[in-house]
Design a protein with these regions (language model features):
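Membrane-embedded beta-barrel scaffold of Gram-negative outer-membrane proteins
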Residues: 14-19, 37-99, 111, 115-117
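Transmembrane beta-strands of outer-membrane beta-barrel pores
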Residues: 18-24, 51, 62-68, 90, ...
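Gram-negative outer-membrane beta-barrel transporters
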Residues: 64, 83-167
Length: 212
């Protein structure tokens, strides 16, 4: 993994990162030989902005992730898989954080992903399953610093996941969904346990039914 960044006096920090990964195979070919690992390469270029006079952090990034040597159906028509498949994903990531006051913090994020089978016996040009193009979230929390409830933090947020393809053949679509989350946290420093807290996180507070 490699990362290059440089912060300017105005609070702008452009950066570029490159990383590689691999995933060992667990299947074998027609001769009983274990397949070679699949490999991943990711490029990311972005900008982070932290103004000197305001508690705000804004980031934006473009990325491309390519996964090669994936298993795919044998073009010869056998029941065995062969190596050589490739999936590429390109996208945009945006995030903003702000402390509106000493007690109030908010976070918002958005991700756009364009994923495609670039090399595959059966699925070339299709979108991989369960990869939504759009995802977004908003979160806010409020912390009490005075009174009998001092140290208590209450938070809530909304997460949106866009529609996605349900299978590699793209024969059906899984619908989008939105869920609400919540948080209650108490800082135990108020009872002599500095550095510790107890928290309750509730995902999907409204018990929304959805397919993921």
């Amino acid at each position: 993994e490699m990362c290059i960044r440089d912060r300017f006096d105005n609070g702008v920090t452009p950066y570029f990162s490159y990383s590689e990964s691999f995933e060992p195979a667990s299947q074998t070919d027609a001769q009983g030989k274990l397949f070679s690992p699949s490999k991943g390469k990711q490029y990311e270029a972005g900008v982070k902005y932290v103004p000197n006079d305001r508690p705000i952090v804004v980031t934006g990034a473009l990325y491309q992730l390519t996964k090669t040597n994936n298993l795919m159906a044998d073009p010869a028509g056998s029941f065995f898989s062969v190596e050589g498949g490739e999936i590429r994903a390109r996208g945009v990531e945006l995030e903003a954080k702000a402390a509106l006051s000493a007690s109030v913090n908010v976070v918002g994020s958005y991700t756009y992903t364009d994923a495609e089978y670039t090399t595959d016996t059966n699925y070339k040009g299709n979108t991989p399953a369960q990869v939504p193009k759009h995802m977004a979230s908003v979160w806010g929390d409020y912390t009490l610093f005075d009174g009998p409830l001092s140290g208590l933090t209450l938070g809530t947020g909304v997460r949106y996941t866009g529609s996605s393809k349900g299978d590699p053949a793209n024969t059906f679509t899984v619908g989008s969904y939105t869920v609400v989350d919540a948080l209650v946290r108490y800082d135990l420093a108020r009872v002599g346990m500095a550095g510790s807290n107890v928290a309750l996180h509730v995902n999907n507070l409204l018990d929304r039914e959805y397919v993921a």
